[in-house]
């Protein structure tokens, strides 16, 4: 605990994904008061053509209480 799942378009290098996971781990541990060893991070790539159906419509749009909302829409 805690577990973070990041979804993004394809195209990031493995090095970028590792760096992202490291930085997210530091931020989570620092702000939530847990050890870095308690944090897990998963990065899933979603094709841009699938983003609206797989992510926006199912995981972003229905959530009224997102702590950070995106600055875009998929209308």
Predicted regions and their residues:
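A domain-level signal for the structural core that forms small-molecule/cofactor-binding pockets
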Residues: 2-75
């Amino acid at each position: 605990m805690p577990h973070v799942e990041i979804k993004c378009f394809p195209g990031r290098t493995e090095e970028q994904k590792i760096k992202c996971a490291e930085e997210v781990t530091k931020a989570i541990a620092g702000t939530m008061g847990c050890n870095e060893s308690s944090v897990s991070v998963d990065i899933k790539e979603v094709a841009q053509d699938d983003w609206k159906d797989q992510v926006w419509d199912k995981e972003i749009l229905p959530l009224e209480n997102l702590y950070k909302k995106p600055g875009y829409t998929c209308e």
